[in-house]
């Protein structure tokens, strides 16, 4: 996600509307917005169309209407996307969706992260690690597990803007630096 200030404002506005209507609506708005944003992200031609000033707002709205119908978007999200079309912000949909997802996670008390290991962990081990991290954080954690053989062993945990590198590769790097310094 970029530092798009306008996208953050639009996401906050839609989120505020959803908050007034309850958590179920927040989730529904998130799902609908995500479906529309995913279509824009997956179709470079669609993203170019929404960015291109040569296409009129009416032409963009016509394409958007079909997209909203295919995504099964409700009235509020449809109105929101039409507002984005009027303001020339349809190309910002992926950023708006990303920030909306962050707001929704914060509302639900969910932390998202990634755990990188040198080998694929068994389901039982992944569940145990996730449970332990949730216990330590005191919050629900959604973890993506990935494998990177370059770390040699150990784990690298990325949560938000924090990284805990407990990999063998990092430890060997520290040892190498200490040897160079004569420690």
Swiss-Prot record:
Protein name: ATP synthase subunit delta
Source organism, top-level taxon: Bacteria
Cellular localization per UniProt: Cell inner membrane
Membrane topology of this protein: Peripheral membrane protein
Source organism (scientific name): Oleidesulfovibrio alaskensis (strain ATCC BAA-1058 / DSM 17464 / G20) (Desulfovibrio alaskensis)
Residue ranges the record marks as coiled coil: none
Keyword Membrane attached: yes
Location (main, coarse): membrane
Lineage, broadest ranks: Bacteria, Pseudomonadati, Thermodesulfobacteriota, Desulfovibrionia, Desulfovibrionales
